[in-house]
A protein has these predicted regions:
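Glycine-rich Rossmann-fold phosphate-binding loop(s) that bind the pyrophosphate
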Residues: 10-14
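Alpha/beta-hydrolase active-site loop signature
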Residues: 36, 49, 119
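Glycine-rich FAD pyrophosphate-binding loop
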Residues: 7-9, 23-45
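Short, glycine/charged-enriched secondary-structure capping and boundary segments
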Residues: 22, 44-48, 125-129
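Short, acidic/turn-prone active-site loops that include or flank metal/cofactor-
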Residues: 36, 59, 143
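N-terminal Rossmann-like dinucleotide/flavin-binding domain of flavoprotein oxidoreductases
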Residues: 43-105
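FAD-binding core/adjacent interface of flavoenzyme oxidoreductases
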Residues: 1-9, 25, 80-147
Length: 147
């Protein structure tokens, strides 16, 4: 079981900003996210889309925002557990216990749920044998806009 000061569920912009704010106060955190990389929807669904509602930043893309947030939290040496889905959250007398689908268990007195709109998955084609083409000629997300 991994122990920390705060467990953050969600590695999107809010989860990453929470790491920063906790780090400033000297608190360590662990971040858990269902996606394979930090950034949430900003990086997964619209990395090139302009974002206009960040205070003091007139415009940036989802990818730029994610890169800046990750750069900002580097000094705090945060441990990320990506490709992990939270299966159970329970509280004992003084701590939260979080269990994931990868059988990892985390213990902390504080928890932040920064899941945005929640875990999302593509609506896959209901075509026979479509899964045989996933990742080669059938894609559900843009991973490289140059391809």
């Amino acid at each position: 079981m991994k122990k920390t000061d705060t467990i953050i569920i969600g590695a999107g912009p809010v989860g990453l900003f929470a790491v920063h704010q906790l780090g400033i106060k000297g608190l360590k955190s662990i971040v858990i996210d269902n996606l394979d990389k930090a950034g949430g929807q900003c990086i997964e669904l619209y990395p090139d889309k302009p974002i206009y509602d960040i205070p003091a930043v007139p415009e940036c893309t989802g990818e730029e925002l994610t890169k800046k947030l990750l750069e900002q939290i580097k000094p705090f040496n945060t441990e990320f557990f990506l490709n992990e889905r939270v299966e159970e959250v329970k509280q004992d007398k003084e701590n939260w216990i979080v269990k994931t689908n990868n059988k990892n268990e985390f213990l902390a007195p504080n928890i932040i749920i920064a899941g945005g709109v929640g875990s999302f998955e593509p609506r896959k084609l209901s075509v026979k044998e479509a899964e045989n083409f996933e990742g080669t000629s059938l894609f559900y997300a843009v991973r490289n806009k140059e391809q």
